[in-house]
Amino acid sequence: MKRLLVLIFGISFLVELNAQKAYSALPKYTAAQVREDALVLKKVLEANHPSLYWYTPKQQLDSAFEQMLNSIADSLNEIEYRNKIAPWVALIKCGHTTAQYSKQFIKQLPKYRYPRFPLQLKFWEDSAVVLSNGYLKDSFVQRGTIVYSINNKPVSYFRDSLFKQIATDGYAYNHQYQTLSSSFPDGFKQVFGVDSTYLIGYMNQAGKQDTISLGNFVPAPRDTNTNRPRPTERKTTLSKRQLRLLAIRSLSIDTITHSAYIRLTTFSKGNLKSFFRRSFKKIQKENIQHLILDLRENGGGRITNSIALTKYLKHSPFKIADSVVAISRKFKHGQYIQSSWLYWLAMNLGASKAADGLIHFKRFEQHYYQPKNRFAFKGNTYLVQGGYTFSAASMVVGALKGQKNIQVVGEESGGGQYGNSAMHIPYITLPNTKLRVRLPLYRMVIDQNRPKGRGIEPDIKIPPSSYAIRMGFDPKMAAIQALIKSKNN
């Protein structure tokens, strides 16, 4: 047993050492090259971004840029450079303006992923709770365990440091919490690197603070022993395409409670218009009285798909926004903007210059969409949202919130309720590092009478809890089921 432990430790050490060598072997860019890239980024954003100073004054953004530029004293690899650029980009407070790795590095990223921090953590407010532990047999730090420190630093230190890397719509910080909760080990490694061990401060089962030392997580190698019997594989009648579609959208019906559940994870793909038509036809046929629409994983997508869904649920005509405005159709520094000619063409065909000198997408400003008559749903509707509910998904919630039969359940949305910058979103590609930054071309004020700067607040707020995580149940769905039961009685 002792020899086995030594062998396992030795393998882990070698894997970690090789990963660190690979990390340090990443191509370096000179200080002059990365400064040039930063200056290119700034001038492209200043010339084309419609909402650059919507939340952050120019003086503050310029000052932060100078500090970032002055901090570049030596050559940097792509990870180090993104760690410099991303906080400045996030300071714009536009959730659609984000710094991303180059296409080439994205292809190589899997080989840099391990070893990494062993705990997946769920963050909210001042809490951090274990979702999973890479060491499955560890009986101390299990799912639902509260973590209060890492290497003698409070978890708030790591949370706040990584928050600086995550862009939001204004001050809709729940998006940062949700994003961090789904990617903490990767974010930790990206910004802080890896240690050989981590001293974890946690709350033990007796309710007292305790510590434990954990190593990095490295997945076990695949078992190549062909003589060992393989586990029985479950046979499925679903094709790969059907499984892909189920991951995007699904409908389930409970005829006992007269309720239907629609899970929708995107508005980008999945033949959604035909799915909506089939689903609401079936809902009507089964005489469903309660509809749960789960948008917690939905980061948005095509506005035309979100409009199609809203038509089945909205009781009155609606329009998309009070204003949808771009600075210009003439892309300055277009050589750095992905397919700028294609976006130029789209803006010339779909938008027009108004008296204020700006480019307006008048279809969304002026046209009122009519609700569906056929298969429209008039029963009790529960919209489930959270920090990932963003862009076109939060537009659906915003359009329906306040309607008599609608209740919004969950947490604050990640998408801004007042407006956002979106529509056409090409990439800026920096000339030396090839780092990419998303560039939304239109500023959309959805409703000028709504509060500016936050996401959509739920009608029924149900935050996460360590108890629910530990016990493995969904408190939001449990609350909705209780509401349905009370209305059926």
Residues covered by each model-derived region:
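Bacterial Sec-dependent N-terminal signal peptides
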Residues: M1-S24, L41
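Assembly/interface hotspot detector across virion components, adhesins/toxins, and nucleic-acid enzymes
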Residues: R3, L121, H367-Y369
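Juxtamembrane/interface motifs at transmembrane-helix termini
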Residues: L7, K103, D169, Y177-Q178, ...
